[in-house]
Amino acid sequence: MAAIKDHPALYGYFLRDEPLPAAFPMLAEWAERIRKADGGEHPLYLNLLPSFVDSVALTCNYREYVRRFISEVKLPMVSFDFYPVTFNGITKDYWYDNLQIVYEESEAAGLPFWAFALSTAHDPYPLPTMASLRLELYTALAYGAQGLQYFTYWNPGTETWNFHEAPINQDKQRSEAYYLVQQMNKELQARAYVFLNSKVVSIAHVGDDMYKGCKRMEDLPPHVVSLSTGSAGAVVSLLEKGSWNYLVVVSRTLDAPTDLNVEFGSKAWTIDREGNAVKLAKGPNTFSIEPGDVAIFKFRK
């Protein structure tokens, strides 16, 4: 560590990926040793398992798994992976519940949480699309994520999972995924001011189906007169930052556009892909949200 701890290219230390609870004491010990050797100048990081892992393997339920990690390992953030888009569609029965648990536990501990999008195809996950990247990342942001990650950049050097067409693919060339991620990042950076250091006020769902962990929207957010979508529904998140509220409505489907009808009782603006605030006309407004995409609005508290 003495050779690298002052290097300008060093951001932090990666402890390990997807540990079981039995490893937490050892990881806590290693974290403390690294902090002492580093002088506390760089963050430490590891990534947790998703919620569909069997509770027998975890030796506890998922909420307790996250809670134990926070209390025992004591890292500055909570990171987890869950890739909801498979060849069979979106794994909605677990994904939203996973996000809700991680949001609640990290919020209770006063820690930010980080989430992933899948940029590398492997069994049973298809090639990424703009729709799948938007769905994963904007949904995470709606749940309060403060860090976004991609799995992975280079094509992993293993045949176990049939990894292929990573942003830097198996031939060490830029793949189509590279340019999708590049476009996604540009879009995210333009709108980052909405999400960075914002606080979640409420998270709810609208639509015909309510999945595990989803809370149906019963009361409209402040200053919202009406809000409705088609049967596929959406995630509806209210964020606050300074004197502004941000209403974030994320599609829950990759199959078709989501029709959003919304009316505000005060002046409101929509945030376009370039991050510009465009004032809305008074009265009801109708939007067609592309598959996996988001509609973002701002209005004063």
Specify the residue positions occupied by each region the protein language model found:
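Glycan-processing catalytic domains of CAZymes
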Residues: 1-266, 272-301
